[in-house]
Amino acid sequence: MEIKTQLRGLPPYQPGKSIEEVKREYGLTDIIKLASNENPYGCSPAVKEAVMKQLDHLAIYPDGYARLLREKVATHLGVNETQLIFGNGSDEVVQIICRAFLSPNTNTVMAAPTFPQYRHNAVIEGAEIREIPLVDGRHDLEAMLNAIDEQTRVVWICNPNNPTGTYVNEQELTSFLERVPSHVLAVLDEAYYEYATANDYPQTVPLLRQYDNLMILRTFSKAYGLAALRVGYGIASETLIREIEPAREPFNTSSVAQAAAIAALDDQAFIRECVEKNKQGLETFYRFCEENGLRYYPSQANFILIDFGIEGNEVFQYLLERGIIVRSGNALGFPTSVRITVGSKEQNERIIHALTQMLKEKQLI
């Protein structure tokens, strides 16, 4: 048997350590996970009731078109139902886009470092990857435009960017979209959209009326707290959605996930509360960094990337042994940094205490 050439040597996605894994490995009982940008407050209480109602129907296939969720999201966004495509997380919508647009003899343009699934799925389709280095942690939009040619099919903007938390503002984005050729799909991945509070963070849904080659990705995994249920979606023109729908797997979002997402979307008060707490948590980390002379990127997401000036794996291991899971920057393109999810007030205080002790022990302050 012979697999596709591009799969040879392509590593599978490596998730961070789970809480149970750390408990077993280190004999610890009190673990906090601040590695995967999950919502530390969970999901809306209304979600649990919605999920329970679905438990009597587990033998029945889900609605493959996600009609009720589609209606709810369309109303929430002010778009037509036919402008939406749903996925098993927005990761799957990334996969659908790559399936639909990329092949050998095409190329795709993206920042580096950024969310790794753009590259991963493009490699599987045999496309050339054109990675444009970040400048000061931000997308270099001019260089990305210059990398586009006749064979380019997709350009990706992660906004806010993962792992830096930086963002492309409204003026920068509209200037960029004006110059993206019509044969290139511009994908705006807004997984952390709900957390962005900057006054000039772009409101992109209205831009769909101007740009037929624009697609926006969003998810219920982050602010909505449904990471375990895997549901995300893409927003684009009716024509574009119709053309890529054949690349979507049938029944790709479960009945439980659809019901949970509807309930989560209904509770915007919960989202507002989480966003405010996240903003306060970021300020706590900013103060810690500034008091200790540490470099960081101001974030529009629910995480912060901090440069400690030593191996990120060393910081990761120090925290792991104390029951705190973060993400080492070694795997993210920032070898002397770690990415920390903003937790609850108590979680933030615990990790900052541990990091302060580390800085003292390693004589970094």
Swiss-Prot record:
Enzyme Commission number(s) of this protein: 2.6.1.9
PANTHER family: HISTIDINOL-PHOSPHATE AMINOTRANSFERASE, HISTIDINOL-PHOSPHATE AMINOTRANSFERASE 2
SUPFAM superfamilies the record matches: PLP-dependent transferases
Family the entry assigns: Belongs to the class-II pyridoxal-phosphate-dependent aminotransferase family. Histidinol-phosphate aminotransferase subfamily.
Substrates-to-products reaction catalysed: L-histidinol phosphate + 2-oxoglutarate = 3-(imidazol-4-yl)-2-oxopropyl phosphate + L-glutamate
Record's keyword annotation contains Cell inner membrane: no
Metabolic or biological pathway, per its Swiss-Prot or TrEMBL entry: Amino-acid biosynthesis; L-histidine biosynthesis; L-histidine from 5-phospho-alpha-D-ribose 1-diphosphate: step 7/9
Gene3D superfamilies: Aspartate Aminotransferase, domain 1, Type I PLP-dependent aspartate aminotransferase-like (Major domain)
N6-(pyridoxal phosphate)lysine sites (modified residues): K222
Record keyword Amino-acid biosynthesis present: yes
Self-association state and partner proteins as the record states: Homodimer.
Gene Ontology terms describing biological process: L-histidine biosynthetic process
Gene designation: hisC
MF term (GO), any: histidinol-phosphate transaminase activity
Pfam families: Aminotran_1_2
Descriptive protein name: Histidinol-phosphate aminotransferase
Alphabetical UniProt keywords: Amino-acid biosynthesis, Aminotransferase, Histidine biosynthesis, Pyridoxal phosphate, Transferase
Taxonomic superkingdom: Bacteria
Cofactor: pyridoxal 5'-phosphate
